[in-house]
């Protein structure tokens, strides 16, 4: 059976203690031979709705904490970058550089990520036609000297894309499952099940969300046939400092992932 990519962890690095508690509970996924696991957390949430919102510990301290997760648990790391000058230092720790959805067309950022040895996960913007993600993929591939296009070229050269919902009026997102099929023509596809149920800005200065839809949408995406899943998860989402309303409670993740593996095995 083909390995399923699983990206999971808290939205933002709230503290080293929390990160280690979550990583400890995720280590079974890292040891599962059917899963290609990446621990995810952000050192800086640079696009929070309000200037008063918690952003994280910053680059230097954040990378130290992520490196300690790597050392302690043997996990691969995924984290996002927001500026081109972050690509090189972050790639010294992270195995995957994530391009945020709002920045998925930023050429300088994509090129900077492509010039590192890290894999690159491009999150499709909420505003973007799914077929247009191919141009972002091509920016990475061509920077790496790859003229070939398509799924195999992207897979071979460490580029994948993530679906995280499309804007549906103000303060709401919907998932068009057709986008998973369309984007998979250009690169391996990850379904970001937690951000797909986000309600941007709906909580008055912060984003809301409908976490009860995380698992049903993930199952639907698995049935379409994709390469992996992205879950932001927390010990207590109600107390999370970022994206709590759309995060999956850590106690629900194991059963959810097992179900996705079963669906993947069937199709």
From Swiss-Prot:
Protein's name according to its UniProt entry = 2-dehydro-3-deoxyphosphooctonate aldolase
Q: In which pathway does it act?
A: Carbohydrate biosynthesis; 3-deoxy-D-manno-octulosonate biosynthesis; 3-deoxy-D-manno-octulosonate from D-ribulose 5-phosphate: step 2/3; Bacterial outer membrane biogenesis; lipopolysaccharide biosynthesis
For this entry, list what GO says about its biological process: keto-3-deoxy-D-manno-octulosonic acid biosynthetic process
Statement: the UniProt record of this protein carries the keyword Glycosyltransferase: no
Nucleus as a keyword?
no
Looking up InterPro entries in the UniProt record yields:
Aldolase_TIM, DAHP1/KDSA, KDO8P_synthase
* Enzyme Commission no: 2.5.1.55
